[in-house]
Regions:
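An acidic intrinsically disordered interaction segment
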Residues: 2-8, 105-107
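Generic N-terminal amphipathic, Lys/Arg-enriched alpha-helix
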Residues: 2-4, 13-28
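Divalent metal-dependent catalytic cores for phosphoryl transfer on phosphate-bearing substrates
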Residues: 20-26, 35, 44-146
Length: 146
C-alpha cells in the first residue's frame, strides 16, 4: 500500500500529486526516488508510534530529498537565499539540499504546513531545538529499509 493510500480526500490528493512530481523529478535517480518513498513510509510509521501528525510526516518524508538531484546548483541557490555555508562549499553540497528545498518548496506546495518545510530543512544536520516532526524525518531518513 502506498503512502497516499493511507489518507483520504485532500490529503490523499496532495500526497499523490507530490509523489507524481517526485517521480518525474527523480526519473534519472531511481534509487533516490525509492529511498524517498521509504522515508515517507518509515516517517508515517514513526509518526503513528510517537503521536506526530501522520500527514505532515508522510509529506516531509516524500519531499525531504527534493533538491538532492541538483547538486551542481545547490551552492548558488543557498547563497541566493542567504544560507550560511561553513567550510568548503563543495563539501557542503551534501547538506544543502534540505535548507534549499525548504526555501523553494512552499511556493510549489503552499498547502503544506511550515512544520513540514522545517523538517526538510533540518533532516541533514539536525538542530538543537528539533520538534518531534523534525526528529521523525531525521530518523526515518537514516533507518528506512531501501
Amino acid at each position: 500500500m502506498s503512502v497516499e493510500d493511507q489518507f483520504e480526500g485532500d490529503e490523499r490528493a496532495l500526497l499523490k500529486r507530490i509523489q507524481e512530481l517526485l517521480d518525474v523529478r527523480m526519473k534519472d535517480k531511481r534509487k533516490r526516488y525509492v529511498h524517498s518513498l521509504g522515508v515517507a513510509e518509515t516517517a508515517l510509521h514513526l509518526a503513528e508510534v510517537y503521536g506526530v501528525d501522520r500527514f505532515d510526516a508522510a509529506a516531509a518524508g516524500l519531499i525531504h530529498d527534493w533538491d538532492k538531484v541538483l547538486s551542481d546548483e545547490l551552492v548558488t541557490r543557498a547563497l541566493h537565499y542567504g544560507i550560511k555555508i561553513a567550510g568548503s562549499p563543495s563539501a557542503a553540497t551534501l547538506l544543502l539540499h534540505g535548507p534549499v528545498a525548504a526555501y523553494e518548496l512552499p511556493q510549489l506546495f503552499p498547502e503544506l504546513s511550515p512544520a513540514v518545510f522545517q523538517a526538510v530543512d533540518r533532516h541533514t544536520v539536525g538542530a538543537c531545538d528539533m520538534t518531534p516532526l523534525d526528529m521523525v524525518v531525521f530518523v526515518a531518513d537514516a533507518i528506512e529499509p531501501n
